């Protein structure tokens, strides 16, 4: 695939979604609330913004328009929260990770745990996977560096999902529908 690792900013002073709000549904207001943050991040040279939970700002939630996942110890880890949009792409990647022999965990991810991931990514419909090369927490002067080279697990998952989408890999889960 044509993936390139990106740099993203951890946003602590803006929230993507309110607790008990509409973060788990696809509505324009969720995207509108992240426009200022993304513009500010772009001005500082970052490609994306990672939001934390609005209640405590201590747990990873998601990017403005994509879910977060991390890879460590042969495990695919993604946040579980009522304010995160349930992503079909993330659901597909969780299944593919399991198919590839990884353990899959949906759970709270404390910000400090970012330091333990070998790979990280943003996943969604448009890019499937945008590998994260580094996450910058400017408020705490911490950089979580995953390497600007795309990780092997991200590559495998991306190629597998793309292979299913384009008919190069057997669709054992019956995800594809022929439309005539």
What do these predicted regions represent?
Residues 1-180:
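Helix-start/capping segments and mature chain N-termini
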């Amino acid at each position: 695939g044509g993936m390139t690792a990106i740099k993203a900013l951890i946003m602590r002073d803006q929230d993507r979604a309110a607790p008990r709000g509409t973060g788990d549904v696809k509505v324009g207001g969720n995207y509108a609330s992240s426009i200022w943050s993304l513009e500010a991040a772009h001005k500082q040279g970052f490609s994306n913004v990672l939001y934390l939970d609005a209640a405590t700002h201590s747990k990873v939630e998601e990017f403005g328009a994509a879910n977060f996942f991390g890879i460590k110890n042969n495990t695919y880890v993604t946040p579980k929260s009522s304010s995160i949009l349930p992503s079909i792409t993330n659901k597909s990647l969780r299944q593919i990770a399991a198919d590839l022999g990884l353990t899959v965990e949906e759970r709270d991810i404390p910000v400090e745990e970012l330091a333990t991931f070998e790979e990280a990514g943003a996943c969604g419909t448009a890019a499937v996977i945008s590998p994260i090369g580094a996450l910058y927490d400017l408020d705490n002067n911490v950089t979580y560096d995953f390497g600007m080279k795309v990780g092997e697990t991200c590559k495998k998952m991306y190629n597998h999902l793309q292979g299913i989408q384009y008919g190069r890999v057997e669709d054992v889960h019956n995800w594809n529908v022929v439309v005539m």
